[in-house]
């Protein structure tokens, strides 16, 4: 606010003197700059400096640091690219649901997304993490949780539309909490004059591991290599809501991904090596 007051004083002095020897051009430029930065005085900035959305960095991180999840790389990067595309107007908020047992990389990938999209990464004021057992522990308080959650989303999206809301341990979340976000992820242009179409919602759940392991093994027995498996190979399970009923039955999910167990990947590798040895011995 000191900068703005100083600017006003300079304009007043120049007006009284009747001339500023070209200084007015500088004042106009400074005024334009400060005008663009005004939102930053009252809250978090919402420009490309704070939200660079570096998809190349995300792709590189996933390739270098994520092991054994071939379905994740292309699906996640493409979904984010198309959602925050300057030449494309998103029709609705992006909703991504990640399933799998502990330690398969769900939170790791979510962290990579935050670090690639935002300059401050996980510390960005545009990133919001909710953990079911910490933030929504009591079933009796579901109506209160719904009100607070809706209020929090509205307030932050009003300041900047490019927000990420992450819900961890969805399988432990009391039924009904996620109903609060339904209006924000539907095909509405505006709700109360607020645009929610650029928002990203990520749901993390520990369900579905056994189901996908069995299906992955079946595909492998049919001769489909793990790196050749596609998201379409799991669409039937997804359409049946086999992974997480608390999300699939309530939320229109844009991208649904099942993270595969790392021990299963090791088993596939060992079996493939045994097959190679057997072929050589024949």
Task: Please provide the spans of the model-predicted regions.
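Extended, charged/polar low-complexity intrinsically disordered regions
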Residues: 2-55, 65
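C-terminal alpha-helical "lid" subdomain
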Residues: 17-40, 107, 111-115, 253, ...
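Pre-Walker A (pre-P-loop) alpha-helix and adjacent loop at the N terminus of AAA/AAA+ ATPase modules
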Residues: 52-94
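Walker A/P-loop
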Residues: 92-127
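Short glycine-rich substrate-engagement loop in P-loop NTPases that contacts/grips substrate
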Residues: 124-160
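Conserved catalytic/switch belt of AAA+ P-loop NTPases
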Residues: 154-155, 175-202, 206-210, 221-222, ...
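Walker B catalytic acidic pair
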Residues: 168-170
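Conserved AAA+ ATPase core "coupling" helix
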Residues: 211-282
């Amino acid at each position: 606010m000191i900068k703005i007051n100083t600017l006003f004083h300079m304009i007043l002095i120049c007006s009284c003197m009747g001339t500023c020897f070209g200084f007015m051009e500088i004042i106009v430029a400074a005024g334009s700059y400060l005008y663009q930065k005004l939102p930053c005085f009252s809250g978090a900035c919402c420009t490309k400096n704070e939200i660079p959305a570096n998809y190349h960095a995300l792709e590189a991180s996933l390739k270098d640091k994520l092991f054994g999840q071939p379905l994740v790389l292309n699906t996640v990067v493409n979904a984010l690219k198309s959602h925050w595309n300057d030449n494309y107007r998103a029709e609705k908020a992006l909703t991504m649901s990640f399933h799998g047992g502990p330690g398969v990389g769900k939170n790791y990938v979510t962290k990579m997304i935050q670090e690639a999209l935002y300059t401050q990464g996980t510390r960005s004021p545009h990133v919001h993490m909710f953990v079911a057992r910490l933030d929504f522990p009591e079933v009796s308080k579901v109506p209160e949780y719904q009100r607070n959650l809706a209020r929090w989303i509205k307030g932050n999206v009003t300041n900047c539309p490019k927000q990420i809301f992450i819900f961890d341990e969805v399988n432990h979340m009391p039924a009904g909490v996620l109903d609060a976000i339904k209006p924000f992820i539907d095909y509405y242009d505006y709700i109360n004059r607020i645009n929610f179409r650029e928002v990203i919602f990520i749901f993390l759940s520990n369900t579905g591991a056994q189901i996908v392991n069995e299906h992955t093994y079946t595909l492998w027995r049919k001769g489909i290599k793990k790196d050749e498996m596609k998201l379409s190979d799991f669409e039937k399970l997804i359409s049946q809501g086999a992974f997480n009923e608390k999300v699939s039955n309530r939320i229109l999910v844009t991208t649904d991904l099942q993270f595969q167990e790392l021990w299963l990947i090791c088993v596939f590798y060992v079996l493939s090596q045994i097959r190679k040895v057997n072929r050589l011995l024949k």
